[in-house]
From Swiss-Prot:
One of its GO terms (molecular function) is transcription cis-regulatory region binding. Interacts with HK2. Phosphorylated by HK2. Residues 146-244 bind DNA. Residues 24-138 form the Response regulatory domain. Was identified as a high-confidence drug target. Disulfide bonds: none annotated. This is Transcriptional regulatory protein TcrA. The keyword GTP-binding does not apply. GO terms for cellular component: cytosol; plasma membrane; protein-DNA complex. Keywords: Cytoplasm, DNA-binding, Phosphoprotein, Transcription, Transcription regulation, Two-component regulatory system. The lineage of its organism: Bacteria, Bacillati, Actinomycetota, Actinomycetes, Mycobacteriales. It comes from Mycobacterium tuberculosis (strain ATCC 25618 / H37Rv). CDD domains: trans_reg_C (cd00383). SMART domains: REC, Trans_reg_C.
Length: 253
């Protein structure tokens, strides 16, 4: 894809202004021609550029370096760009990430952005557009850490995929976490089964499926019953609601 990108990298009279100088950028790309193209072009723009060719080295470099932005290819040997970005966010590294990939499907873009990427550029691309996006990321600076979501003493950390009840950490599966996150983002609001199915499952599950009820039960077994509380309420004929106060304690018998 490097040749195609070069062909679209013309710098005409309409080139954008507002260069941000002195920016340190890490380029994570395993294709040598593309790496050389990006490193040369970014250096000519006045940036300091480092390069690595695989996901593991990318995580180590960003975690140990002081970068202003990362240009991250998705298709990498070892661990891919999606996982690289997710690991960085779990490690509380908030350096802006621009995903760079030949995969232009909407689902791929969503996966990258949901995983913590700040922007997404599909190959083949125009270098001037890349520069403009990096300028925007540099002006924005490091993204703030996503807030911990809370309902009473129940806490969910979206960036680290961790959940606690008071001081006790609770282990959830990926789907349990996704369902709880949908509920805790709007505590006190009734969510219909259809809404939860749409947000947390793919189109393979039909509206009449009882998969939502099954996972609500799984969640209750982990976040409620061991602590003697009821936070997940069934609203008959409507759906489910997570209490804003994190759950009422069961009355002693």
């Amino acid at each position: 894809m490097a040749d195609e990108t070069t062909m679209r990298a013309g710098r005409g009279p309409g080139r954008a202004c507002g260069r941000v100088s002195g920016v340190r950028i890490l380029v994570v790309e395993d294709e040598p021609k593309m790496t050389a193209l990006l490193a040369r072009a970014l250096t000519e723009e006045g940036h300091t550029v480092d390069t690595v060719a695989d996901g593991r080295h990318a995580v180590a470099a960003v975690d140990g370096g002081d970068y202003d932005a990362v240009v991250l290819d998705v298709m990498l040997p070892g661990i891919d760009g999606f996982e690289v970005c997710a690991r960085l966010r779990r490690q509380r590294v908030w350096t802006p990430v621009l995903m760079l990939t030949a995969r232009g499907a909407v689902t791929d873009r969503i996966a990258g952005l949901d995983g913590g990427a700040d922007d997404y550029l599909t190959k083949p691309f125009n270098l001037d557009e890349l520069f403009a996006r990096l300028r925007a990321l540099s002006r924005r600076g490091p993204i703030p850490r996503p807030p911990t979501l809370e309902a009473g003493d129940l806490r969910l950390d979206p960036s680290e995929h961790r959940v606690w009840r008071a001081d006790t950490e609770i282990r959830l599966s990926h789907k349990e976490f996704t369902l709880l996150e949908a509920l805790i983002r709007r505590p006190g609001i009734v969510h219909t089964r259809a809404q939860l199915l749409e947000r947390c499952w793919d189109a393979a599950y039909e509206a009449r499926s009882n998969i939502v009820d099954v996972y609500i039960r799984y969640l209750r077994d982990k976040i409620d019953r061991p602590f003697g509380v009821t936070s997940l309420e069934t609203i008959r004929g409507a759906g489910y609601r997570l209490r804003k106060d994190g759950g009422r304690h069961a009355l002693p018998r």
